[in-house]
C-alpha cells in the first residue's frame, strides 16, 4: 500500500522524521519497503508566466519564450512543446535545478544559436506521468515564482508499506493512522461519522434489495443520488489518488476510490438510468446472488466474461450488472452524461470474493480488500462520507437509502493475565544499569499500550497474592484478527518494541529424537531393503469368508468386507497380479497390522511379512547353455538369514506342517531365544498351481513385537568385542542323517557338544546337501564346515582335534549318524 505522509499527517499529528517513522512501522510489523521522497523530484522548479512566444529563427519545431519567473527580468527559454503559447502559467526548472525522474541537471545552454536559461517542464519530466503531449499548464490561480511542488502534490513523501495478511484494517489510511497514533502517542484526528438514515430492506421506495445468500453478503447499503454533475475532480482529490497510484477519472468515480483508500471500504457507483433500463421494472430490484451456468457479463475492462457458479453477482431485475466485490459492468458504468447514480456499499464474505476473483483471473483494489476482510463496523461511516462528498463536489441530492443488514454482533471480550504476559514476553531491558534483578512490564504499562490501540480494559477482582487479570473489550475494527489472549500479548510486544525485551534462552531445552521403536523400525526397513526387498503396502480390508475374520456389517463393497488376519495372503496376491501383468518376479516385504477374533474376543497385532520369488537369472547375462533356475529353499532362507545376521540374531528353524498353503517339507517355524518369532516356507505346489504362479516362491511372516523387543534389548546393551588376530582352523564334517532330522537340531547339538558360544567353536555352516544315488533310503548326506579359533592365542592341532572329535561322538551317540569324514 502507498501511504501519503501529507495525508497521514492530516489524520494523526505525527512529527517524526520520515526515516524514523518508517523504522517504527517496520518494527511494529508493517514493513516499509521503499520511501519515495517526491520533494526531490522538482526542487528548483517554480511557476512561470509566458509573456511572449516566438518561432525559433533556426529551428522549425522550436519556440523562443520570454518567461517571467518572479526574479526581475524575464528569462529567455527555448521550448519544443507544441502547446507553448503566450499567456500560460507553466512549471519552469531554473538553472541549478535537478529533475530526478529523468536524471537531468538544468544548466544555461545555447540551442541552435539562441541562449536558453531554463526549461519549461511537462508532467512526465516531473515524474507524474509516463508520457506527456506537451508542457503542463496551471489552470487555477497561481503566483509567479512560487514553488510548484505544493501545486502538483510533490511536497509529499510516499511510504511503500506491506502489512501482514491478518491486518486487513491496515489497507486504509484510517487504519494506518490508528497504528501510527498508537506507536507514537500522537493525537488521532478522525472525521466525525456523519449520520445516515437508511430505510430497511423491503420498505417502499425506488429500490428493493434481494440478498439471496446473507452468508455471502451480510450487509448491503444502496443510496440513490440524483442530479449529479459529472466533472473532473478538484485538484486535491486528484493528487490524493495519484499519490496512491490510482488514475483520476471523474468526480463520482474518484470519490468512491478516495473512500476505498481512506476507510478501506470498497464502493461502486452505477448509472441509475442505465440500471433501470436493464432491470426493466419499477421499483428496481437490486439483488446479490451467485451466477448461473451460461451467464456472461462485460466488465469495465471491456472483457466479455463467462461466469461460473463461484462468481457472486450484483443484479438488476435478476440481470447481472457487476462482479460483486471485484469489478462493475460496462453496461451500467458512470459516463460523462450520467445524471443519477446508485451508490453501493456492501460487505462480502472473504472466501466468496477470493474464489470469484480467482475464477476470473481478476484482482482489483476492491477484491484485495474484500479477500482480507473489510471492517464491518464502519460501513455506515464510509457511506456517509461518500454521500457528503457527492453532495459537495458533484452537487447531488440524496433521494433514497436502503440497507439490508444481517451482520453478526461485533462484540468480543477476552481475559488477559499479567502472569501470562510475563511468561511469554519475559523481562524487559532495564533502564537501571546497576540492577541485577529482572524487570517486567507493569500493569499500568500494559493498560496504556492496549488503550492506545482502542482496547477497553477493566481489572477483575483478584486475590492479594495473584497478579492482575483484565477483561479486555476488542474494538470493532480489530474484530477479525484479535481472537485469543495470545493475540493481545502480541499487540503489547509489538507496541512496546521487540527490541526492548531481554534476550533470554528457554530455561530448559531437550534435543529432539525419534522414539526407540521408530528408530528400530527404520533400521528393520533398511535391512530388508538392503537384502533386495521392496517395501509394499496393502489395504487392511480383504474379502470375507475366512475363519476368525472381523467382518463389517454393512461394507461398501464385498471385496473389502473383512479385516485381514495375516500378511501372506496379500503378498501372494500382489505377486500374482504382477505376474499376470508380465512384471519381473516380486521380492518384497510389508509391515502392517493384522486382526482376528477367538473365544477370548477381538485381537490385533503388528506383523512383518515378506515374499521372495525373484529369479536370480532373469534380466542377467547368462551362458547360452545355462537355463534360468528357480530360487532354492536355501537361497531364499539365506536372504532372510542375512537380515538376522545384520542384527546379530540367532534364529532357529524348526520343521512345521500346520499351514496348508505352504510346502510341508519346506516350512519352518522361526524361534528366537525360545520364543516363536514367525514362519518361513515355500508355497505349496498345489496352491501355487491354483493361482497360476511359479512354485518356487517363498514367504515369511514375523511377529513384529517379538522382533523389536529382541532388537531393543541388543540396542540398549550393545556389546563391543575385538576381532581375533589369531588364525582359524577349519574342519569339515560329513555324514548320513535321517531326512526327518532338521539342520537346526543338528546345529544345536554341535554347539552344545562344543561348549556353547563361548567355546573355541566360532561358526557352523552347512555347505552341502545331497540325497539320491549312493545315499541310504530315508537319509540324506549333509556336510558342515566348522571353524575353530581362540581370541588370545593360536589353537594347537591337538586342541582342535579333541574338540572336533567330541562333536563327532555327540552326533553319533544322539542321532546314530553315519560319519563319512
Swiss-Prot record:
Pfam families in alphabetical order = B3_4 (PF03483), B5 (PF03484), FDX-ACB (PF03147), tRNA_bind (PF01588), tRNA_synthFbeta (PF17759)
GO BP terms: namely: phenylalanyl-tRNA aminoacylation
Question: Which residues are in the B5 domain?
Answer: 409-503
- Residues binding Mg(2+) are 481, 487, 490-491
The protein's UniProt keywords, in alphabetical order, are: Aminoacyl-tRNA synthetase, ATP-binding, Cytoplasm, Ligase, Magnesium, Metal-binding, Nucleotide-binding, Protein biosynthesis, RNA-binding, tRNA-binding
Instruction: Give residue ranges for domain tRNA-binding.
Output: 39-149
Q: Which cofactors does it use?
A: Mg(2+)
| FDX-ACB domain mapped to chain residues | 724-820
Name of the top EC class for this enzyme: ligase
Where's it found, cell-wise? Cytoplasm
Kindly report the protein's main subcellular placement as a broad class: cytoplasm
Q: Show the catalytic activity.
A: tRNA(Phe) + L-phenylalanine + ATP = L-phenylalanyl-tRNA(Phe) + AMP + diphosphate + H(+)
Among the GO molecular function terms of this UniProt record, one is: phenylalanine-tRNA ligase activity
- Which E.C. number(s) belong to this protein? 6.1.1.20
Cofactor note text: Binds 2 magnesium ions per tetramer.
Gene Ontology CC annotations of this record: phenylalanine-tRNA ligase complex
Fetch the NCBIfam families from UniProt: pheT_bact, YtpR
**Which family would the database say this protein is a member of?**
Belongs to the phenylalanyl-tRNA synthetase beta subunit family. Type 1 subfamily.
Q: How does it assemble?
A: Tetramer of two alpha and two beta subunits.
Instruction: Please give the name of this protein.
Output: Phenylalanine--tRNA ligase beta subunit
Organism encoding this protein: Thermosynechococcus vestitus (strain NIES-2133 / IAM M-273 / BP-1)
Amino acid at each position: 500500500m502507498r501511504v501519503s505522509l501529507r495525508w497521514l499527517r492530516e489524520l494523526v499529528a505525527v512529527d517524526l522524521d520520515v526515516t524514523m517513522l518508517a523504522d517504527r512501522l517496520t518494527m511494529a510489523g508493517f514493513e516499509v519497503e521503499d520511501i519515495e521522497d517526491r520533494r526531490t523530484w522538482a526542487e528548483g522548479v517554480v511557476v512561470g508566466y509566458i509573456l511572449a512566444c516566438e518561432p525559433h529563427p533556426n529551428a522549425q519545431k522550436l519556440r523562443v519564450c520570454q518567461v517571467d519567473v518572479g526574479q526581475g527580468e524575464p528569462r529567455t527559454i527555448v521550448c519544443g512543446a507544441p502547446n507553448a503559447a503566450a499567456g500560460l502559467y507553466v512549471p519552469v526548472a531554473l538553472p541549478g535545478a535537478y529533475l530526478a525522474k529523468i536524471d537531468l541537471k538544468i544548466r544555461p545552454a545555447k540551442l541552435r544559436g539562441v541562449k536558453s536559461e531554463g526549461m519549461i517542464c511537462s508532467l512526465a519530466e516531473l515524474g507524474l506521468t509516463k508520457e506527456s503531449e506537451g508542457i503542463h499548464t496551471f489552470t487555477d490561480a497561481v503566483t509567479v515564482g512560487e514553488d510548484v511542488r505544493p501545486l502538483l502534490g510533490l511536497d509529499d513523501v510516499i511510504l511503500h508499506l506491506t502489512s501482514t495478511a491478518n491486518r486487513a484494517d491496515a489497507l486504509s489510511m484510517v487504519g494506518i493512522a490508528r497504528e501510527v497514533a498508537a506507536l507514537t502517542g500522537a493525537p488521532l484526528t478522525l472525521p466525525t461519522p456523519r449520520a445516515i438514515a437508511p430505510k430497511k430492506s423491503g420498505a417502499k421506495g425506488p429500490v428493493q434489495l434481494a440478498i439471496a445468500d446473507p452468508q455471502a453478503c451480510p450487509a448491503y447499503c444502496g443510496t440513490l443520488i440524483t442530479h449529479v454533475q459529472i466533472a473532473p475532480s478538484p485538484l486535491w482529490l486528484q493528487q490524493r489518488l495519484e499519490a496512491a497510484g490510482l488514475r483520476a477519472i471523474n468526480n463520482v468515480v474518484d470519490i468512491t476510490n478516495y473512500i476505498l483508500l481512506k476507510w478501506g471500504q470498497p464502493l461502486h457507483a452505477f448509472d441509475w438510468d442505465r440500471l433501470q433500463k436493464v432491470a426493466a421494472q419499477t421499483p428496481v430490484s437490486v439483488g446479490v446472488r451467485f451466477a448461473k451456468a451460461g451467464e456472461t457479463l462485460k466488465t469495465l475492462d471491456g472483457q466479455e466474461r463467462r461466469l461460473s457458479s463461484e462468481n457472486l453477482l450484483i443484479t438488476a431485475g435478476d440481470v447481472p450488472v457487476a462482479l460483486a466485490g471485484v469489478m462493475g459492468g460496462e453496461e451500467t458504468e458512470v459516463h460523462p452524461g450520467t445524471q443519477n447514480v446508485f451508490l453501493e456499499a456492501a460487505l462480502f464474505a472473504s472466501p466468496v470474493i477470493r474464489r470469484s476473483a480467482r475464477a476470473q483471473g481478476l484482482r482489483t483494489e476492491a477484491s484485495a480488500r474484500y479477500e482480507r476482510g473489510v471492517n464491518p463496523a464502519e460501513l455506515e461511516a464510509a457511506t456517509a462520507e461518500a454521500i457528503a462528498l457527492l453532495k459537495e463536489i458533484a452537487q447531488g441530492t440524496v433521494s433514497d437509502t436502503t440497507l439490508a443488514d444481517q451482520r453478526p454482533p461485533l462484540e468480543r471480550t477476552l481475559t488477559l493475565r499479567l502472569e501470562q504476559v510475563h511468561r511469554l514476553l519475559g523481562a524487559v531491558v532495564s533502564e537501571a544499569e546497576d540492577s541485577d534483578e529482572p524487570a517486567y512490564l507493569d500493569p499500568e504499562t500494559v493498560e496504556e499500550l492496549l488503550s492506545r490501540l482502542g482496547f477497553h480494559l477493566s481489572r477483575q477482582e483478584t486475590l492479594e497474592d495473584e497478579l492482575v487479570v483484565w477483561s479486555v473489550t476488542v474494538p470493532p475494527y480489530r474484530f477479525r484478527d484479535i481472537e485469543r489472549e495470545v493475540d493481545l500479548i502480541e499487540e503489547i510486544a509489538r507496541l512496546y518494541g521487540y527490541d526492548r525485551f531481554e534476550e533470554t534462552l528457554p530455561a530448559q531445552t531437550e534435543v529432539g529424537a525419534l522414539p526407540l521403536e521408530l528408530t528400530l523400525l527404520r533400521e528393520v526397513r533398511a535391512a530388508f531393503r538392503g537384502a533386495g526387498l521392496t517395501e509394499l503396502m496393502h489395504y487392511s480390508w480383504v474379502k470375507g469368508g475366512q475363519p476368525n475374520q472381523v467382518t463389517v456389517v454393512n461394507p461398501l463393497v464385498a471385496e473389502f468386507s473383512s479385516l485381514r488376519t495375516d500378511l501372506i495372503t496379500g503378498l501372494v496376491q500382489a505377486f500374482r497380479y504382477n505376474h499376470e501383468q508380465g512384471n519381473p518376479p516380486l521380492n518384497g516385504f510389508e509391515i502392517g497390522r493384522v486382526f482376528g477374533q477367538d473365544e477370548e474376543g477381538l485381537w490385533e497385532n503388528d506383523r512383518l511379512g515378506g515374499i521372495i520369488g525373484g529369479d536370480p537369472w532373469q534380466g542377467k547375462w547368462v551362458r547360452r547353455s545355462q537355463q534360468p533356475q528357480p530360487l532354492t529353499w536355501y537361497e531364499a532362507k539365506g536372504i532372510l538369514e542375512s537380515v538376522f545376521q545384520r542384527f546379530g540374531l540367532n534364529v532357529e528353524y524348526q520343521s512345521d506342517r500346520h499351514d496348508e498353503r505352504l510346502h510341508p517339507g519346506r516350512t519352518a517355524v522361526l524361534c528366537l531365544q525360545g520364543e516363536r518369532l514367525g514362519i518361513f516356507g515355500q508355497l505349496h505346489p498345489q496352491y501355487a498351481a491354483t493361482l497360476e504362479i511359479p512354485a518356487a516362491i517363498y514367504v515369511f511372516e514375523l511377529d513384529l513385537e517379538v522382533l523389536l523387543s529382541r532388537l531393543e534389548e541388543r540396542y540398549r546393551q550393545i556389546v563391543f568385542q575385538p576381532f581375533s588376530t589369531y588364525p582359524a582352523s577349519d574342519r569339515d564334517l560329513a555324514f548320513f542323517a535321517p531326512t526327518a532330522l532338521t539342520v537346526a537340531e543338528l546345529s544345536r547339538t554341535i554347539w552344545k557338544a562344543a561348549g556353547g558360544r563361548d567355546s573355541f567353536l566360532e561358526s557352523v555352516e552347512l555347505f552341502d546337501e545331497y540325497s539320491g544315488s549312493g545315499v541310504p533310503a530315508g537319509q540324506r548326506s549333509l556336510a558342515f564346515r566348522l571353524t575353530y579359533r581362540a581370541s588370545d592365542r593360536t589353537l594347537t592341532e591337538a586342541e582342535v582335534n579333541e574338540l572336533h572329535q567330541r562333536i563327532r561322538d555327540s552326533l553319533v551317540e544322539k542321532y546314530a549318524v553315519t560319519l563319512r569324514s
